C-alpha cells in the first residue's frame, strides 16, 4: 500500500505501513470516528491515528508507557493522552525498556535479546533505560 489514497490525493500517512489509510478506506472515509492508539510514541512518528484526528475529525485516546516521550505526545495531540503500561493483568510490576520506538515490556518470548537491543541503540546513538512500571 502506498502512502496516498487514489480518492483523496491530499491524504498523507505517517503510519509505518499505511494502517491509517486502511482504516479510512475500510470505513469509507468516515468522519468523527473514535480510536485507541496503544504505543503512540510522540503522537506523530509512525502514528496510526494522527491523520484520523487531524484530517477526519476523529477523537480518541493515545497511550504511551515511555515517560521520556510522553510529554511530546501530550503536546503533539489534541486527544486524551495517557502515560501508562497496559496489560491484561492489573497491578503487576513489569520491567519496561525505554528506547524510543523500540521500547518494550520484558518477557521471556521476545525475539531480540536485551544485549542486541542495547547494541543497536548504541550504534544509532539512541538513549536506553529500564524502569519498573505497574500495569493497568
Identify the function of each model-found stretch.
Residues 1-136:
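Phosphate/nucleotide-binding beta-alpha loop and adjacent structural elements of enzyme active sites
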